Swiss-Prot record:
InterPro entries: Amelin. GO terms for molecular function: growth factor activity; structural constituent of tooth enamel. Ameloblast-specific. Located at the Tomes processes of secretory ameloblasts and in the sheath space between rod-interrod enamel. The gene is AMBN. Residues 104-126, 264-311, 333-421 are annotated as: Disordered. This is Ameloblastin. The modification Hydroxyproline is found at residue 37. Keywords: Biomineralization, Extracellular matrix, Glycoprotein, Hydroxylation, Phosphoprotein, Secreted, Signal. GO terms for biological process: biomineral tissue development; cell adhesion; odontogenesis of dentin-containing tooth.
Length: 421
């Protein structure tokens, strides 16, 4: 008896342990928010807050940890501070740009000026202007000019003061905000940015705003496959589903590979990234149509044409003229074997609604294609090129099954794939 009980006991333990392991692998360690599996899931509010930060507009792929490392996704979730929070992590071009352009520093002395320095000790405020003298400079401008031109060659003299007088008025508006910056002399230029940052406090951003204000960039370590390069346009709430999310948890923990969509995640989106999607031009047409829930059962022309005659060209003409707008389809009235109405429009077999009631028809393209008269004919080559034979749709074997209702969504989707002529 004890020999029988021990294996049962061990079996129970093993089953329990296996169940716990399965549960621990199925329940994600990090709670999944609904969103695209491979993309860092950010809500719209978080995206707008992050997009307003100046520091995230840089290309964060070039991080301190090397190219394309996964540490950048930690910035997205706020686990690491953003770039703009530390002065020493701020990119170098802020300092140099303000040092050179927005706060104009005095230009280097011209080659003619050092010869003037020992001759005229009275001119030293012009040659080494500190912040204080440059503020007083416009006041003194009228006073020292008459003695300048006495007894000196005019060319050298004109060069020196003219440059300084051009610089001084442009300096005065920015420098007037910082009156006491004598320790930040341009004679010690390595100290100058640090001293200016300390004395000035937070630097006002007088940079022009970046070219694409709403975008910031994210890098994905392994996921060059399907993920977008920018998140500023769409948040991950709005994106269509990517191919099962190559970087969700399978990249970090290989145990999570197969069971990603099971528990706690959204079901994988049926419109995979590899498939095509339809874009409707008019907002009215985007709300209707068989894709948007009007279904084949409610009398859309696709279903009726299919029940009437599975191989009738009206199926292709209705769908193609509605969705592709007639660009690849027959123009109206040019469908062979169909009776024409008085206006030259195809009446079709009796079960088919006329093409004006087609919910997918874009209004602008419908008007453009009314212009064919009743008696016009297209040339033979064009008509042969545009008729819907079995070479035009590689998936048309679905349409030849007469009563197969299960294939109808497949028909609707696949009838719009045309080969290039």
């Amino acid at each position: 008896m004890p020999a029988l009980k021990i294996p049962l006991f061990k079996m129970k333990d093993m089953v329990l342990i296996l169940c716990l392991l399965k549960m621990s692998s199925a329940v994600p360690a990090f709670p999944r928010q609904p969103g695209t599996p491979g993309v860092a899931s950010l809500s719209l509010e978080t995206m707008r807050q992050l997009g307003s930060l100046q520091g995230l507009n840089m290309l964060s792929q070039y991080s301190r940890f090397g190219f394309g490392k996964s540490f950048n996704s930690l910035w997205m979730h706020g686990l690491l501070p953003p770039h703009s929070s530390f002065q020493w992590m701020r990119p170098r071009e802020h300092e140099t740009q303000q040092y050179e352009y927005s706060l104009p520093v005095h230009p280097p002395p011209l080659p003619s000026q050092p010869s003037l320095q020992p001759q005229q000790p009275g001119q030293k405020p012009f040659l080494q202007p500190t912040v204080v003298t440059s503020i007083q400079n416009p006041v003194q401008k009228g006073v020292p000019q008459p003695p300048i031109y006495q007894g000196h060659p005019p060319l050298q003299q004109v060069e020196g003061p003219m440059v300084q007088q051009q610089v001084a008025p442009s300096e005065k508006p920015p420098e007037a905000e910082l009156p006491g910056l004598d320790f930040a002399d341009p004679q010690d230029p390595s100290m100058f940015p640090i001293a200016r940052l300390i004395s000035q406090g937070p630097v006002p951003q007088d940079k022009p705003s970046p070219l694409y204000p709403g975008m910031f960039y994210m890098s994905y370590g392994a996921n060059q496959l399907n993920s977008p390069a920018r998140l500023g346009i769409l948040s991950s709430e709005e994106m269509a589903g990517g191919r099962g999310g190559p970087l969700a948890y399978g990249a970090m923990f290989p145990g999570f590979g197969g069971m990603r969509p099971n528990l706690g995640g959204m079901p994988p989106n049926s419109a995979k990234g590899g498939d095509f999607t339809l874009e409707f031009d008019s907002p009215a047409a985007g709300t209707k149509g068989p894709e948007k829930g009007e279904g084949g059962a409610e009398g859309s022309p696709v279903a009726e044409a299919n029940t009437a005659d599975p191989e009738s060209p009206a199926l292709f003409s209705e769908v193609a003229s509605g969705v592709l707008g007639g660009l690849l389809a027959n123009p109206k009235g040019k469908i062979p074997n169909l009776a024409r109405g008085p206006a030259g429009r195809s009446r079709g077999p009796p079960g088919v609604t006329p093409a004006d009631a087609d919910p997918l028809m874009t209004p602008g393209l419908a008007d453009a294609y009314e212009t064919y008269g009743a008696d016009e004919t297209t040339t033979l080559g064009l008509q042969e090129e545009m008729t819907m034979d079995s070479t035009a749709t590689p998936y048309s074997e679905h349409t030849s099954m007469p009563g197969n209702k299960a294939q109808q969504p497949q028909i609707k989707r696949d009838a719009w794939r045309f080969q290039e002529p």
